[in-house]
Amino acid sequence: MKSAVVLLPGLNRDRDMIAALTKISGKPPVTVWQTDTEIPDVDLIAIPGGFSFGDYLRCGAIAARMPVMRAVAEKAAKGVTVIGVCNGFQILVEAGLLPGALMRNTSLKFVCRQIKLEITNANTMFTRRYQPGQVIRSPVAHHDGNYFADAETLARLEGEGQVVFRYAEGTNPNGSINDIAGIINEQGNVLGLMPHPENLIEAAHGGSDGRALFEGALGIAA
């Protein structure tokens, strides 16, 4: 399975994502730069975490307006799988590929620790290797991960099963409404989440709870 990783100034988790995708798929992903207007034929596009363009204006606001994001949107519209992690999630929201907004953590502090995630919807390409209600571990590292959506949008997300990851009870690190940690679009091929599953894919790194997400997204057989 082929994958691509989007590179933008200020992103600093690209090597983590590249290493994870290489380890899981057996093939190094291609990389696409901010000015690229086309993305090769791939099965998965990943937007990693970091601080694109220094998080000026709003987290992800400048990155979302780069030429490469128009190419990402075109691929997503054709059904290509897209995943945005941390700043990648913020970029997807700013680009209009996912609804809602990501605000400053309620603590007003940068949060970096391991948390527990509940699989809210296991009937997606990203979560099909997990069990409904399963609780997994994942690192978080962000300052603006407080997910918010208006009442109508929130009701639609909850009602249509678009909330796929939720911070397990008592572990919400940022104040996200309804403990939301990750959502998908209506078509089910675009995922955004604040935690970093790419940092927990093998035992040598403390566990492999995040591995199944990428295996599912890449369509790797169990």
Curated annotation (Swiss-Prot):
Keywords: ATP-binding, Cytoplasm, Glutamine amidotransferase, Hydrolase, Ligase, Nucleotide-binding, Purine biosynthesis
Taxonomy, superkingdom: Bacteria
Compartments in which it is found: Cytoplasm
Catalytic activity: N(2)-formyl-N(1)-(5-phospho-beta-D-ribosyl)glycinamide + L-glutamine + ATP + H2O = 2-formamido-N(1)-(5-O-phospho-beta-D-ribosyl)acetamidine + L-glutamate + ADP + phosphate + H(+); L-glutamine + H2O = L-glutamate + NH4(+)
Main location: cytoplasm
Residue intervals of the Glutamine amidotransferase type-1 domain: 3-222
Pfam families documented for this protein: GATase_5
Subunit structure: Part of the FGAM synthase complex composed of 1 PurL, 1 PurQ and 2 PurS subunits.
Function of the protein: Part of the phosphoribosylformylglycinamidine synthase complex involved in the purines biosynthetic pathway. Catalyzes the ATP-dependent conversion of formylglycinamide ribonucleotide (FGAR) and glutamine to yield formylglycinamidine ribonucleotide (FGAM) and glutamate. The FGAM synthase complex is composed of three subunits. PurQ produces an ammonia molecule by converting glutamine to glutamate. PurL transfers the ammonia molecule to FGAR to form FGAM in an ATP-dependent manner.
Protein name: Phosphoribosylformylglycinamidine synthase subunit PurQ
Organism of origin: Mesorhizobium japonicum (strain LMG 29417 / CECT 9101 / MAFF 303099) (Mesorhizobium loti (strain MAFF 303099))
